[in-house]
């Protein structure tokens, strides 16, 4: 039976809401603040999956006993340059520093996700290589002033209009860079929300 199953996205990110909606699976949103500091003893891949699980668990623990068969999805995205993870910028100067380092070369974007259901956790991640062309200091400053990318890992949103002129290559899932590897997440959720065979 799937009628009582309810999918909950452990995020208030408008980008992740839009991406999860692409799966066609109805869902609600909820989020709880957690410490998203990376564990230096873990790889970046394990960190994004671990934080995704922590986000999902934090929401799962807040659900009432009569919440039905809840399925909670948590996700975490980071940008990796030369093996170092770049989180969200603290201010405009930090954002400028990040974008100055990213411009004119390629970097990795990793998104981990965790699906909690019936006491079990499904965790995975996706990796995308993004190449950003050369940007002048003025172009970087304008982007920061207009788009205010302070809630984005690496200080940029690949979907932002002012960045489109500088994205010179993508190897992997585009949606992963936006914040959720839609195809991988859908493949993991599909067995939990099977469609009628005649649809």
Swiss-Prot record:
Coiled coil: none annotated. It is an enzyme of class 3 (hydrolase). The record marks 15, 77, 159 as: Important for substrate specificity. This is dTTP/UTP pyrophosphatase. InterPro entries: ITPase-like_fam, Maf-like. SUPFAM superfamilies: ITPase-like (SSF52972). Signal peptide: none annotated. It comes from Chlorobaculum parvum (strain DSM 263 / NCIMB 8327) (Chlorobium vibrioforme subsp. thiosulfatophilum).
């Amino acid at each position: 039976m799937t009628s009582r199953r309810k999918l909950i996205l452990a995020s208030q990110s408008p980008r992740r809401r839009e991406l999860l909606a692409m799966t066609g699976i109805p869902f609600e949103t909820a989020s709880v603040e957690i410490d998203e500091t990376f564990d230096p003893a873990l790889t970046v891949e394990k960190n994004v999956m671990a934080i995704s699980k922590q986000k999902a668990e934090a929401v799962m623990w807040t659900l009432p006993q009569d919440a039905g068969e809840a399925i909670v999805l948590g996700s975490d995205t980071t940008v990796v340059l030369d093996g170092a993870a770049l989180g969200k910028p603290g201010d405009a100067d930090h954002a400028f520093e990040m974008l100055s380092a990213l411009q004119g070369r390629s970097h990795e974007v990793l998104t981990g996700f965790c699906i909690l259901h019936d006491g079990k956790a499904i965790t995975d991640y996706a990796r995308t290589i993004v190449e950003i062309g050369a940007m002048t200091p003025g172009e970087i400053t304008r982007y920061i002033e207009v788009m205010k990318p302070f809630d984005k890992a690496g200080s940029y949103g690949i979907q932002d209009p002012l960045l489109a002129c500088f994205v010179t290559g993508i190897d992997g899932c585009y949606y992963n860079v936006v914040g959720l590897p839609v195809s991988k997440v859908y493949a993991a959720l599909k067995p939990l929300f099977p469609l009628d065979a005649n649809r």
